[in-house]
């Protein structure tokens, strides 16, 4: 019997989707509510791999999703998502419950951090375009330990062209 939890090709198997109480920041990341479960939890053992995006095959140089800033809702960005991926991108949101209230709340919080950073910089007289590039570098590039910020796709969407310029500069090799 194949053990999918140990299979690198099954990257979704590593996310417990809010179902594990013994995680860092459990008060934020864990929920007893079934509606809050995402990723591997709703996927379970269902054979949906042909209907959803494979994380190993998503092109790095295009943005697939956009977000509603006031709700944190994830939406396929039909302006930037390649047409041949739109159906699978929608299925991915639905099948993995990527609009679980827990995830939407966490996305809103990430957006609010960026909004606060921008508001503070503007109040200090910093030039907006320059600051967006600084934010993109600080929030999208790995830190000294090689770790990236949570909600990379949200940050990428929010920072728009500044994010795309930084990612392009680094050859999307993040």
Annotated model-derived regions:
Residues 1-35:
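Histidine-centered nuclease catalytic patch
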Residues 2, 59-61, 125, 151:
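Generic detection of intrinsically disordered/low-complexity segments and helix-coil linkers/edges
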Residues 14, 71-73, 163:
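A generic structural signal for solvent-exposed, polar alpha-helical segments
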Residues 24-47, 121-136:
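A broadly tuned preference for mixed-charge, low-complexity surface segments
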Residues 33-119:
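Conserved, surface-exposed functional patches that form binding/active-site neighborhoods
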Residues 80-174:
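C-terminal, charged low-complexity interaction regions
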């Amino acid at each position: 019997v194949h053990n999918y939890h140990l299979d690198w090709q099954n990257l979704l198997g590593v996310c417990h989707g809010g179902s594990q109480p013994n995680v860092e920041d459990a008060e934020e990341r864990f929920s007893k509510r079934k509606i809050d479960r995402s990723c591997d939890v709703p996927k379970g053992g269902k054979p949906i791999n042909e209907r959803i995006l494979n994380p190993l095959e998503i092109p790095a140089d295009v943005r697939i999703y956009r977000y509603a800033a006031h709700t944190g809702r994830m939406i396929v960005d039909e302006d930037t998502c390649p047409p041949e991926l739109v159906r699978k991108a929608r299925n991915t949101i639905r099948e993995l419950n990527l609009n679980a209230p827990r995830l939407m709340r966490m996305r809103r919080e990430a957006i609010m951090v960026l909004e606060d950073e921008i508001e503070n910089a503007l109040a200090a007289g910093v030039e907006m375009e320059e600051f967006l590039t600084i934010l993109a570098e600080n929030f999208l590039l790995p830190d000294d330990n090689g770790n990236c910020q949570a909600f990379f796709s949200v940050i990428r969407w929010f920072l728009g062209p500044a994010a795309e310029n930084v990612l392009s500069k680094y050859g999307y090799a993040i």
